[in-house]
């Protein structure tokens, strides 16, 4: 069953929540979407999870989808961590006790999720971290001077239109690309320089703190991703202190592996991984 609601952050930002409920959930996943998109795009994925007994709860980040806030704008990356905290708190309190909760992030949502686990998850009871095509490292082809210039522009001209996302790079499935282009809730205009600079700052913080992450970890990425760096996922998985980590690299897949030609493979792997860890956690309760 699908339902929506709203909740306000301590800053007064109204966030739009999506919940796909399973009848008797075996596990819950709290999802953080990527830059310039929104959580409703995960409906097909959520239905697959529900069929396996996994509940999905997701939030439109501030400035995205149906949430309030200036479009795709943040003053500091910690603003997104506040949104993540609201999502996790709602997920913890809105389902039956004893159902393990996993935090998942796609693309920039993966940056948020990883940093949240590294810096703030001690007060939460998370059963694992799932990262989909996470933005964890600048692209290998991006010159250092361009990164430095982006930070400067983000400071002195924060709303400068810095970059756009080409929908053709999301998936090899043409229907996915066209649906994205027609979606009025997707932000199709340029991303402000401040938002881009803060995303880079988030990556730097993760690199310094990733060794502290010890949760069970499932990381997957397409090798042909041109929007986020596949090596970022490889390096992150190798650098954490998790003793239960899985890395799945999908040969030839584009950025949205959940919507690409290999989606059945990755969704099945994600479901299997989640249910095994959920069963392990329940056995320890």
Question: How does the language model describe each region?
Answer:
Residues 106-191:
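Alpha/beta-hydrolase-fold enzymes
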Residues 213, 219-221, 225:
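Short beta-strand/loop motif that positions the catalytic acidic residue
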Residues 226-232:
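Conserved alpha/beta-hydrolase "acid-adjacent" motif
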Residues 26, 34-37, 108:
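Active-site glycine-rich loops that stabilize anionic/oxyanionic intermediates
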Residues 1-22:
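N-terminal cap/lid segment of alpha/beta-hydrolase-fold proteins
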Residues 74-93:
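Alpha/beta-hydrolase active-site loop
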Residues 46-70:
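Conserved alpha/beta-hydrolase
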Residues 244-285:
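Catalytic active-site module of serine/aspartate enzymes centered on a nucleophile-bearing elbow/loop
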């Amino acid at each position: 069953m699908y339902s929506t609601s709203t909740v306000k952050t301590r800053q007064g930002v109204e966030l739009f929540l999506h919940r796909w409920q399973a009848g008797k959930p075996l596990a819950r996943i709290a999802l953080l979407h990527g830059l310039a998109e929104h959580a409703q795009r995960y409906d097909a994925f959520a239905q697959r999870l529900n069929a396996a007994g996994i509940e999905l709860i997701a939030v439109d980040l501030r400035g995205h989808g149906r949430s309030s806030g200036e479009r795709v704008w943040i003053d500091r990356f910690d603003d997104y961590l506040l949104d993540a905290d609201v999502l996790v708190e709602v997920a913890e309190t809105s389902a039956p006790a004893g159902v393990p909760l996993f935090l998942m992030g796609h693309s920039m949502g993966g940056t948020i999720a990883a940093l949240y686990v590294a810096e703030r998850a001690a007060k939460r009871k998370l059963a694992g971290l799932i990262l989909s095509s996470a933005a964890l490292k600048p692209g290998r082809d991006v010159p250092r001077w361009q990164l430095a210039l982006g930070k400067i522009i983000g400071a002195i001209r924060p709303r400068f239109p810095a970059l756009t996302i080409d929908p053709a790079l999301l998936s090899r499935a043409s229907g996915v690309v066209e649906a994205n282009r027609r979606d009025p809730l997707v932000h199709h205009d340029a991303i402000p320089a401040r938002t881009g600079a803060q995303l880079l700052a988030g990556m730097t913080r993760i690199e310094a703190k990733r060794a502290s992450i010890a949760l069970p970890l499932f990381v997957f990425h397409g090798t042909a991703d041109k929007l986020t760096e596949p090596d970022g996922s490889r390096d992150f998985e190798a650098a954490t202190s998790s003793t239960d980590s899985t890395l799945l690299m999908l040969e030839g897949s584009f950025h949205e592996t959940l919507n690409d030609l290999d989606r059945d493979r990755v969704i099945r792997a994600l479901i299997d991984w989640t249910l095994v860890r959920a069963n392990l956690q329940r056995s320890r309760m």
